[in-house]
Amino acid sequence: GNRLKPQRPGWLSILFQLQGVVTVDPDGKNAKGRWYGMGMEAKPTVSLHEGDLRQTWINGVYENEYVKEDGKWKIKKLHFNLTFRTPYEDGWLKVPVVGQNGPDPVVKPDAPSTSYAPYPSGYCVPVHFKHPVTGK
């Protein structure tokens, strides 16, 4: 039988993981991967015009961890560092999405957020690998 949960009405989320760099540990059982994420979403708004569908652009950086079990690679940790989420109509240069910046009402966070800014302020997500040219 199908064990997948039914989709939430009005939701669409397409997020591509692009330009990946995967580093396998010397033990051959663990790895880390860094990917850029770019995509689009459509979902009901949380507070503004409750229930209206809102289309957005979304962008960020993944820093993931993988583990090899029984000869198969599995995701150990999937971590997305949000750079921006903004209305499709306005583009990402104008405004962040108002009313969708809080926790998802369906998928609750496992811990409180430590900080939030609608756009990054020059922060660069730490890289897990050495620079391929300089080695630093």
Locations of regions flagged by a protein language model:
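Hydrophobic-ligand binding "helix-grip"
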Residues: 26-28, 38-60
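Glycine-rich loops and low-complexity Gly/Arg-rich segments
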Residues: 41, 57-62, 99-106
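Terminal "cap-and-tail" regions of soluble proteins that handle hydrophobic small molecules
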Residues: 49-53, 69-136
